[in-house]
Regions:
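Membrane-water interface regions at transmembrane-helix termini and the short interhelical loops
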Residues: 1, 18-37, 87-94, 109-119, ...
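Membrane-interface alpha-helices at helix entry/exit sites of multi-pass transporters
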Residues: 42, 78-87, 135-145, 179-184, ...
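Flexible loop linkers connecting adjacent transmembrane helices
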Residues: 1, 23-42, 67-90, 112-138, ...
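C-terminal transmembrane helix pair
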Residues: 296, 308-312, 358-379, 383-417
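Individual transmembrane alpha-helix segments
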Residues: 89-100, 265-278, 364-365
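Membrane-embedded translocation segments of transport machinery
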Residues: 135, 139-293, 300, 305-359, ...
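N-terminal alpha-helical transmembrane segments of multi-pass membrane transport
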Residues: 1-83, 199, 222, 226
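Helix-loop-helix module between adjacent transmembrane segments
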Residues: 13-21, 54-58, 93-164, 172-198, ...
């Protein structure tokens, strides 16, 4: 209630600071040294960026969030054409450049100090300019512990949302019970799959899963583009991008100062907090896979490519839901208000092959779940092993299990509110 303004100013500072690094003399620095070469192809790199950075969340909110803003916008009246345009602009704000700027800066700092200054790939290394050699003593330990806690609870939020969506999807498709017991069983099963992926390592586990996520997501995206309101989606993608950019400064610096409600706390500040809590995990993971890239390539790629992909996904799925509502074709909003986790499944009910696409959506949620869990486990594992890129298998298994346990405890303790 008292520090919303600080969040707003901070995330804008992060974005401008990241762009400064890209276009200043520092943009020519190569992560890992002058002769370093990238470990992964651009395609695999982009796939891992997107899967780790957004993953489950974008599947959960791509349909639901635009509809919520459509019915209850921060300004003006809801359920109008103007409200639909503002809904997409607001959703773009929450999932756009600011989120990726947070990840970009954390990842850049970790990569530079680790690969160019031969320091551990651990969160403490970022603070070396301020703490000096103390980063190797108890202050550094405290920093890494806080990073581990932020990662565990940030991941637990997304994993909890993901398992709610899987459970709701199974209930929607197969009429299986959508109960707390079902969700806990799903967490255990999917955490087991994530553990197997973690043991397999980065190249055999996370990389292959990320590529599968992108491929399956592309199939669903093409499906909705072809069988959905194709022209509307393409038109609105261009218009949404223009609206986002033209209103960028107004939206980015808006603090609800002249209309005191809880809307911004519930949405924008929640998102900025969520992305910041994810930044140790995603930043560390991005740093781990970005060796060999120049600072300019790194910053611009991490900022722009996932943002454009995210915007296309939101426009295709969220835009299709708005199209159905504006034309009175279907009432997706009522279903979303009843159970937000079923939003994408109810959307598919309005197109052919609904059972096939709903099943594919469930598989994609599970795959993103596993990807987030195993990449998060690798990051926490690195934090707790002094920045080592390879650690004992038992330690990786422990952290993969711990993430599932935290998500299960939060679900049992308070459901969506606790998450």
């Amino acid at each position: 209630n008292n520090f919303g303004w600080f969040f707003v100013l901070a995330v804008n500072f992060y974005l401008f600071f990241a762009l400064y690094f890209a276009f200043s003399k520092y943009g020519r620095i190569r992560l890992g040294g002058r002769n370093a070469v990238p470990e992964f192809s651009r395609g695999a790199w982009f796939a891992m960026l997107f899967s780790a950075g957004m993953g489950i969340g974008i599947l959960f909110w791509s349909v639901a969030e635009p509809l919520f803003h459509f019915t209850d916008p921060p300004l003006n009246n809801g359920e109008t054409v103007q409200a639909a345009q503002e809904a997409m602009k607001t959703t773009f704000l929450h999932w756009g450049l600011h989120a990726w700027a947070i990840y970009t800066l954390v990842g850049l700092a970790l990569a530079f100090f680790s690969f160019n200054r031969n320091m551990p790939l651990a969160f403490r290394s970022i603070f070396y300019p301020m703490l000096g050699e103390k980063v190797y003593k108890w202050p550094g330990d405290v920093i890494d512990v806080l990073a581990v806690l932020a990662t565990l609870f940030g991941l637990a939020t997304s994993l909890g949302l993901g398992v709610k969506q899987v459970s709701a999807g199974l209930n929607h498709l197969f009429s299986s019970p959508d109960t707390l017991t079902t969700r806990v069983v799903l967490i255990v099963a999917i955490t087991g799959a994530a553990t197997i992926s973690v043991v397999s390592g980065l190249n055999q586990g996370v990389k292959k899963l990320s590529e599968m996520n992108i491929n399956l997501g592309a199939v669903l995206l093409v499906f909705i583009l072809i069988l959905g309101p194709t022209v509307f989606i393409l038109d609105s993608y261009a218009q949404n991008l223009g609206s986002y950019l033209s209103g960028f400064f107004d939206k980015s610096f808006w603090t609800e100062s002249y209309r005191q409600t809880t809307w911004q706390n519930q949405w924008t500040i929640f998102y900025w907090s969520w992305w910041i809590s994810w930044s140790p995990f995603v930043g560390m993971f991005i740093a781990r896979i970005s060796r060999g890239r120049s600072v300019q390539e790194y910053v611009l790629s991490v900022l722009i490519v996932p943002t454009l992909l995210t915007f296309l996904w939101i426009t295709a799925f969220g835009g299709s839901a708005l199209f159905l509502e504006l034309n009175g074709t279907a009432d997706v909003i009522s279903a979303v208000k009843e159970n937000v986790a079923t939003s994408i499944y109810h959307l598919f009910e309005n197109f052919p092959l609904a059972e096939v696409t709903n099943f594919a959506a469930i598989v994609l949620v599970i795959s993103f779940f596993v990807t987030s869990s195993d990449s998060g486990s690798l990051v926490v594992d690195a934090f707790t092993s002094g920045g080592k890129l390879k650690s004992p298998v038992t330690q990786r298994v422990f952290w993969a299990s711990m993430e599932g346990a935290v998500a299960a405890i939060l679900l049992i303790g308070g459901g969506l509110k606790a998450l």
